[in-house]
Amino acid sequence: VRFTSCDAVLAQARAVKSEWELEKIRRCGALHAKVLDEILPERIHPGMSEFDVARTYVEAVFACGGSGMLRMNAPGEENFFGYASADTSGIYPTYYNGPLGCKGMCPAIPFMGNAERLWQKRALLSIDMGFNVEGYNTDRTQVYWSGAADTIPGPIRRAHAVCVEIFEQTAAALKPGAVPAAIWA
């Protein structure tokens, strides 16, 4: 008996989504947006710890029907939600292949957020947490500012403008048949 890997065939099959699957992803994205755009801004505030922000996110996800588990087709990339990082905590080193890091709950659980790190006034809070409905994920990194829009420093405004430009270019490249790895490169 000779065994042969079928990973490539499975990856090709998973790359093409049916309308049924696309609807699951759209529903997941709509619920994810509701949590980040509507629910969280009403519930989080400066003075909260990263962990408390993460817990607030988790409560909202479950209340909206999310499963809480993110499964991705890569080694070591099955995780529970993600990160809430206040200010420079987001540059904390991590093994995760994503835009954000954080100290986490403890060295053994480098996710969610740290209970001792507080979100200060006039500071950034970055949340890189996914959403899953029935096995279909959406992922989004959301940045909040704890102050009036006119108090955002120039360097942060410029960095945001670059991020928006990258987002728009990437979105324009995402068309049926496009290979995400080619866009990522």
Task: Pin down the residues of each PLM region.
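Active-site neighborhoods and metal-handling regions in enzymes and metal-associated proteins
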Residues: 1-185
